[in-house]
């Protein structure tokens, strides 16, 4: 099983965790979830107030954004792990990947690079990748398309009818995540604009989109599309 298979497995597990939270939000909004308070030895059920409900809905955007960013980071990492495991040398990879590696090397310490290099044609590929430099809080549909173009994998997914939804949802998730992360807006303010049902619809659309992107990257790796086609005999 290739590295991308583990990425897909992790994505499915994380998606399931996120789904459970969104179902909880739906139950909460429908009054199926209550707080149990003990008063003088007696338990009393109280409906959760709207402000707390909105705060919890605001947190949903962080879960969605983390799902998107972690999935894309892990998928890109799988490409480089494939190159390392198959000992693919720098001169054999496609020009787009060469550019990425060379740009990444600009910020590296030359002394540390020399410490790690034994075979420059192979080691430069692994040294020229840093997972933590990918998608630092700014991922949306535009960046995913640009990343696909940079690496050479397909950014189109099967569900073309919902392209506008995907674009607007990804932008909404990114903007809300950044507002929350930077303290620009309170969680309750972010959460009050959507119902739980609307959030579930957003989640379903994003999960299906990410599945399609992962399938495209899996095809890219399986078909060795990371190789320079001009080197193919």
What are these regions (language model features)?
Residues 36-44, 83-102, 198-208, 225-233:
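Charge-rich, acidic-biased intrinsically disordered regions
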Residues 63-64, 71-161, 166:
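Helix-loop junctions and short alpha-helical segments
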Residues 46, 50-66, 163, 170, ...:
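Short, charged/polar micro-motifs that form catalytic or ligand-binding hotspots
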Residues 29-30, 69, 73, 88, ...:
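Amphipathic alpha-helical interaction segments
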Residues 68-72, 178-181:
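Short alpha-helix boundary/capping elements
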Residues 1-62, 76, 91-93:
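Charged alpha-helical initiation segments
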Residues 2-30, 34, 153-233:
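Polyanionic, low-complexity intrinsically disordered segments
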